[in-house]
């Protein structure tokens, strides 16, 4: 029961994070998703230090990325053996089911999830009816705090 409640809470936080990320003002459009689309998104950020940049892509785009000739040649066949999404230009690529038609090149400074307090768990048991009640509460805010640190990647219409 608690495992399911935790998953619901994590899914809500993920949805809130994605909703804030979609407010990004920087945008890079592409004809076909792959190495060039990500590199253009990185360039759009115009950062001197790219060490904290990462890319978040929809799960469905992993295959396109793995088939990209630039990606395959950069990994020198390694992708065939380890099966990971990997890195592009030394930047980690993360895939998620929470995205469907948009990817993001960003740093952790772009979107913040600020917790007011840790998750609070309360439980109660009615001894006569043998009913247990468990309530989880959390208070947080998720916000796009630095729009210069996130670039939305979308396909040309």
Regions found by a protein language model. Give the residues of each.
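Long, contiguous amphipathic alpha-helices that act as assembly "spine/axial" helices in icosahedral shell
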Residues: 1-28, 46-49, 55, 93, ...
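Extended, solvent-exposed, turn-rich assembly/linker loops in the middle of proteins
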Residues: 19-89
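Sequence/fold signature of self-assembling virion shell proteins
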Residues: 68-157
């Amino acid at each position: 029961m608690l495992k399911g409640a935790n998953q619901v809470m994590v899914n809500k936080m993920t949805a809130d994070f994605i909703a804030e990320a979609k407010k990004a003002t920087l945008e890079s459009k592409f004809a076909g998703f792959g190495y060039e689309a990500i590199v253009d998104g990185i360039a759009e950020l115009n950062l001197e230090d790219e060490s904290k940049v990462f890319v978040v892509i929809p799960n469905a785009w992993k295959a396109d990325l793995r088939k990209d000739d630039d990606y395959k040649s950069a990994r020198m066949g390694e992708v065939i053996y380890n099966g990971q999404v990997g890195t592009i230009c030394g930047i980690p690529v993360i895939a998620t089911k929470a995205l469907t038609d948009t990817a993001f090149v960003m740093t952790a400074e772009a979107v913040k999830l600020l917790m007011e307090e840790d998750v609070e768990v309360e439980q109660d048991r009615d001894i006569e009816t043998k009913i247990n009640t468990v309530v989880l509460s959390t208070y947080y805010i998720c916000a796009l705090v630095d729009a210069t640190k996130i670039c939305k990647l979308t396909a040309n219409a």
